[in-house]
A protein has these predicted regions:
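A residue-level signal for conserved active-site and pocket-lining positions in enzyme catalytic cores
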Residues: 43, 277, 399
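Intrinsically disordered, low-structural-confidence terminal and linker regions
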Residues: 1-18
């Protein structure tokens, strides 16, 4: 598997990218020349992250915004209503190429969970949530006398109470006489014997029609009478089902290509990916990159060795770019590390022209689906790492909506399900130890004896263990002292 070669920098103090504080972000840092995927897996399971060749770990007790490593169990992942809405939105766009009404004019839609167009924010490569501000349209609000309106409504209810009772009774009788339940729910007139019935909402009418159709299908005539049977429930659609909901007649085609960062395919598409990155950084973060070198340094160059094993995925372990091609146009790129137990999200950028598709959340779902796909052949690979969860930064809390998600205890290094109880504790105090029961002696942590076997790079071609290095250093120090004493002795003589 090779060696991991690092240059440890020690404790670093810098500006915080989350609370924007000056000289308040405290972390440990090191430069990694090369690293095996297994070693990096062990590092991120101890709270480390990488940005290019630089690896860092927040000192959560001292830093302004404690960062907790978060992962999602992809094999137990549950779609929310908001996730389904985003997946269906993509399906409709691919089918007919039209935007929804709320998206016409380039206005981003806000979903039910309060998320808007998710981009990438922060150093840990996690997608951002809603923007700093949501600007509401400047429409003057009418002055309404709520007290007078409330009294008028109560008087109206008193006058109509008797009529409504009669209407409901007649309506129920007519329902009982009908032999075709499907027709009953499709009535276009909400009247009965000249009495107006209360209007139903469109959603309620659709639900009634759906239930009536299901009931009609479950009626089987036997011996001159009808016998009802239970209708089997439709199985809930999986993430893969939503993604596969495409046809050859669709107006647009979306394809995802995954390519290693040192492959010919990456080089062939470098021009398009850099142009997309430049557009994203300029329009979303107002931070235009200086040149392509900055892009490569940040998102292409990786210390992880690309290695393939018999028990690993066919594409191997290492650093990859997952490219989103809409027809022949590159609209998004996800930077990923594929490790022995997980797929780790490094960064994500997209074309702002397609922000109405909520590509940040959509790509998270596609990356979870990638884990599920890899897990079918590699049983140990089942987690999706989303970088850091910063509870004190509201924009980063969206990560906890991918359920089930787990946070890493910063002291015991054990995983804990992100629940409302943990959220309440983090609301009360930013730094928390999630495992109060584990004693120090039980923690699977680096012990002092292990350092004797760590290899130190003396020059480009020579490595020695830390124990040998200490012995050699002591020998050189004694020789230096001895030579100094001999010189002093000769001068004195």
């Amino acid at each position: 598997m090779g060696l991991t070669v690092i240059d440890y920098y020690g404790k670093q103090i810098s500006k915080c990218g989350y609370c924007k504080g000056i000289q308040c972000s405290i972390s440990h840092g090191m430069h990694t020349y090369q690293m095996t995927p297994h070693d990096y897996q062990d590092l991120i399971d101890r709270g480390w992250r990488r940005s290019g060749h630089y690896c860092y770990k927040q000192d959560n007790k001292m830093t302004c915004c404690p960062c907790y490593t978060i992962k999602c169990d992809a094999l137990e992942f549950k779609l929310t209503k908001s996730h389904k809405k985003i997946l269906k939105r993509m399906t409709r766009f691919l089918r007919d190429g039209k935007k929804e009404r709320s998206e016409i004019g380039g206005t981003p839609t806000i979903n039910n969970e309060g998320e808007g167009d998710e981009g990438q924010s922060g150093e840990d490569g996690a997608r951002g949530g809603i923007g700093d501000e949501i600007h509401r349209p400047n429409i003057p609000v009418k002055n309404i006398n709520l007290e007078a309106a409330g009294k008028a409504n109560k008087n109206r209810q008193k006058r109509l109470t008797g009529e409504e009772k009669v209407a409901r009774t007649l309506y129920e009788k007519s329902e009982a006489k009908s032999n075709d339940p499907a027709k009953d729910t499709d009535r276009s007139q909400n009247t009965c014997d000249g009495v107006n019935l209360p209007c139903k909402k469109a959603k309620q009418m659709r639900l009634e029609r759906s239930l009536a159709k299901q009931a009609a299908k479950c009626v089987s005539p036997e011996a001159g009478m009808t016998k009802t049977r239970k209708c089997p429930k439709n199985p809930e659609k999986s993430l893969r089902d939503f993604i596969d909901d495409v046809t050859n007649a669709d107006r647009h085609k979306l394809r995802l290509n995954i390519t290693h960062v040192k492959s010919k395919q990456f080089e062939d598409t470098l021009k398009q990916s850099y142009a997309l990155y430049e557009k994203y950084q300029t329009l979303i973060h107002n931070d235009r990159p200086n040149n392509v070198h900055d892009y490569l340094e940040f998102l292409q160059r990786s210390p992880l060795k690309h290695c393939k094993t018999e028990d690993g995925p066919s594409i191997g372990f290492g650093s990859f770019h997952q490219q989103y091609w809409l027809d022949d146009q590159l609209i998004a790129v996800a930077v990923l590390d594929i490790l022995p137990y997980c797929v780790s999200s490094v960064y994500f950028f997209y074309d702002p022209d397609y922000s109405f598709l909520s590509l940040g959340t959509y790509s998270s779902l596609r990356e979870i689906e990638l884990v599920q796909q890899l897990a079918s052949s590699v049983s140990s690979l089942r987690y999706y790492y989303m970088g850091f969860y910063i509870h004190s930064c509201p924009k980063m809390r969206y990560k906890g909506k991918l359920c089930p998600s787990y946070l890493l205890c910063p002291e015991a290094f054990t995983w804990h399900l992100l629940t409302d109880e943990i959220r309440s504790k983090l609301n009360a105090q930013k730094y928390q130890r999630f495992n109060p029961e584990v004693l120090a002696k039980d923690i699977d942590e680096f012990v002092e004896a292990d350092i004797n076997n760590v290899l130190l790079l003396v020059d480009q071609n020579t490595c020695i263990t830390y124990n040998d290095y200490i012995q050699v250093s002591i020998a050189f120090f004694l020789l230096y002292i001895l030579s100094f004493d001999m010189e002093a002795f000769s001068l004195f003589k």
